[in-house]
Structures are given as structure tokens and as C-alpha cells.
Curated annotation (Swiss-Prot):
This is Fruiting body protein SC7. Keywords: Fruiting body, Glycoprotein, Secreted, Signal. It comes from the Eukaryota. Coiled coil: none annotated. Belongs to the CRISP family. It is found in: Secreted. The keyword Secreted applies.
């Protein structure tokens, strides 16, 4: 029997202490002046020496996002290598929690070893939340609303194959393949007040 598990989590823009919970379980924060995600001194050297993902992989990330955005009146995102470097740095730590605001996470587990990366699994899971979006409360689909958020203009993503026993799993769990998908966005979406910013940024 084939068994796989996908976990998804999103974080609000400018959250003071991000946590690996669904964005809609938390109150949005106020929109403020933001700049692209900073690279801290701890990881600056590592990021400077990190190779960019191959263009074929970048194209997959952008296609998965922009096909969905095109259906909801949002312009196509462009690739942001700074955000991608930061995503790769975080993904490689295999920690199931957020590193910053304006970020979507997904994890895919399989009991079969050496399963290949599949970007559409991560982004596809976020996009699949669309039917859960509540246009009255502007809640229920935090990952999807970040994907289609109109004010967001660029994205940088990374995928990393984590060892068993990471990403919140136990070493005794059956998962032999653990893929971690991380995307960072600028400008971050999911900001408040909801009734002001969601109607102009999320087109169902």
C-alpha cells in the first residue's frame, strides 16, 4: 500500500514569533513598511556561496505559482534569488517551523527511500486550499491567499531532502523520504485589517 503524508503551514507577515501553525489560526498583523527578508550575519557567508537552483527548477516553482495567480487576477511573480537562498538555508536545517514572515512551508513524507523531489506536491497543496477560503471572514486558506496575494511581486523557494527523524517526525516513524519545501515572498501577504487588505489582494 502506498502511503504518503503532506504537511502544510503558512506564516503571517511580520509576525513577532512565527510558529508552525496555519495562518488562519492567528490574527493578522498590521501592514507596515517592509523590505525584502534580511540575511542575518549567521548565514550570510553560507548564502553568498550557495549556487542558484537550476533554471528548470526555478521554472517549476514559478509555473506552479503563476498558473494559480493568473486565475485570480494577480500578476506573475518573478524569481528572487535572495529569498531563494534564505529558503535553502532554512530548509537545510530540517526544522519544522518558520524562520520569518511571508513564508509558506510544506513537508512530504514517504515510506519509500529516495523518492524524487516533486515541486507540484508542495505548491499544489497550498493551491488546493482555494475551496476553503471564506470570503466573509477572509480565512481558511492561508497558504493559498499568500500564493495569489496581488501585492506580492517576487518569490524565492527551495526544496531539501531531510533525514528520517526530522521535521517533527520520530526516528521510529516509517518515513524514509522527507522532502521539505520552503517559499519566501515579497511583499508578504496575509496582512490586516482583513476587511481592508484581503478584498483588494485576493480575488476568488
Amino acid at each position: 500500500m502506498k502511503l504518503t503524508v503532506i504537511l502544510l503551514t503558512a506564516v503571517l507577515a511580520a509576525s513577532a514569533s512565527p510558529a508552525p501553525v496555519d495562518v488562519d489560526a492567528r490574527a493578522p498583523v498590521a501592514l507596515d513598511s517592509r523590505s525584502p527578508i534580511d540575511i542575518d550575519s549567521r548565514s550570510a557567508d553560507a548564502l553568498a556561496n550557495r549556487a542558484a537552483p537550476p533554471q528548470s527548477e526555478i521554472d517549476q516553482w514559478l509555473k506552479a505559482h503563476n498558473n494559480e495567480r493568473a486565475q485570480h487576477g494577480a500578476v506573475a511573480l518573478v524569481w528572487n534569488q535572495t529569498l531563494s537562498d534564505k529558503a535553502a538555508d532554512w530548509a537545510s536545517q530540517c526544522i519544522w517551523e518558520h524562520s520569518n514572515s511571508g513564508q509558506n512551508l510544506a513537508a512530504w513524507f514517504s515510506p519509500q527511500a529516495n523518492k524524487p523531489m516533486n515541486i507540484s506536491q508542495g505548491v499544489g497543496g497550498w493551491n488546493a486550499e482555494e475551496p476553503d477560503y471564506n470570503t466573509t471572514t477572509y480565512s481558511g486558506a492561508g497558504h493559498w491567499t499568500q500564493v495569489v496575494w496581488k501585492s506580492t511581486t517576487s518569490v524565492g523557494c527551495a526544496a531539501y531532502s531531510c533525514p528520517p527523524g526530522t521535521l517533527g517526525r520520530k526516528p521510529t516513524d516509517p518515513w524514509k523520504t522527507l522532502w521539505y519545501y520552503v517559499c519566501n515572498y515579497y511583499r508578504p501577504g496575509n496582512v490586516s485589517p482583513r476587511d481592508k487588505y484581503y478584498p483588494i489582494n485576493v480575488q476568488p
